[in-house]
Design a protein with these regions (language model features):
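N-terminal beta-loop-helix "entrance" segment that forms/cooperates
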Residues: 31-53, 228-230
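Solvent-exposed alpha-helices and their adjacent loops that cap or buttress functional pockets
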Residues: 6, 57-59, 105-109, 149, ...
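Extreme N-terminal starter segment of soluble prokaryotic enzymes
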Residues: 1-5
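Glycine-rich phosphate/diphosphate-binding loop of Rossmann-like nucleotide-binding domains
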Residues: 6-27, 137-224
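Short, small-residue-enriched loops and turns at beta-alpha junctions
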Residues: 43-45, 73-74, 193-197, 228-229
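N-terminal glycine-rich phosphate/adenylate-binding segment common to multiple enzyme folds
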Residues: 45-145, 156-158, 245
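Buried hydrophobic positions in well-ordered alpha/beta secondary-structure cores of metabolic enzymes
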Residues: 11-14, 63, 116, 174, ...
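Glycine-rich phosphate-binding loop
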Residues: 58-73, 210, 215-246
Length: 246
């Protein structure tokens, strides 16, 4: 039986990569009906958006999509198609296995860890205001009323939402993944020493969730120390769960 799959080739190196992917899939003998849909800068003139509604409808219908890289303008222009897809379909868990391969040239052997990253909130949520916007002035006044020293008048602002519900959802996902896949430890990665309200909330929820999984070891690490640990001894890690920014 053939499977219906949406293919979004993307732009730049995207079409080349997705063509190679199709050859690999064809070599397996699995029958795929490719529903090719275009998104990105190449469709802006025609549809006025990098992610037309008919692309979203196609993905919703098949429930499976493979996407090549899509250009995101730096500092200006349309927002990331990747982020838009994640938010539209509530694709809250970005799961990245990291596994040593023969001949990879790394000085580390037998690396086998999984990064579980929250995909829908934090600074990547896209709540931003340009310098000079009325919202920036309103936020400045709000900060002043709270008794804190406000920011410079010519600032641009990004808002960092971290919620209890979405923190719990991603941490529970990480623990359930660990349990299902025979993993032994979950590490919550954060910057709660500085961002006490937001990352502090994430860490507090992670600790609460961890108490429900006594069969899985839990610890937490500041993101700076995590990065150092990953390059010094990646074998110390198993499953890492972290907010969207990291």
């Amino acid at each position: 039986m053939a499977h219906d799959v949406v293919l979004i080739p993307g732009d730049g190196i995207g079409p080349e990569i997705t063509q190679a992917m199709r050859r690999v899939v064809e070599a397996t003998g699995v029958q795929i009906n490719w529903n090719v849909q275009e998104a990105g800068a190449g469709v802006m003139d025609e549809f006025g958006t990098p992610l037309p509604q008919h692309v979203l409808d196609a993905v919703a219908e098949t429930k499976v999509a493979i996407k090549g890289p899509i250009t995101t303008p730096v500092g200006t222009g349309f927002r990331s198609v990747n982020v838009a897809l994640r938010k539209h379909f509530d694709l809250y868990a970005c799961v990245r296995p990291c596994l040593s391969q023969p001949g990879d040239g790394s000085r580390f052997r037998d690396v086998d860890l999984v990064i579980v990253r929250e995909n829908t909130e934090d600074l990547y949520a896209g709540f931003e205001f340009d310098e000079g916007a009325a919202e920036v002035e309103e936020l400045s006044q709000l900060v002043e009323r709270s008794g804190q020293k406000t920011f410079a008048a010519d600032s641009a602002i990004s808002i960092k939402p971290i919620s209890i519900a979405k923190s719990r959802r991603i941490v529970e996902y990480a623990f359930e993944y660990a349990r299902r896949c025979g993993r032994k430890k979950v590490t919550a990665v954060h910057k709660a020493n500085i961002m006490k309200a937001t990352d502090g909330l994430f860490l507090r929820v992670a600790r609460e969730v961890a108490a429900n999984y006594p069969d899985i070891e839990f610890n937490d690490k500041i993101v700076d120390a995590t990065c150092m640990g990953l390059v010094q001894n990646p074998n110390d890690f198993d499953v890492l769960v972290l907010p969207n920014l990291y």
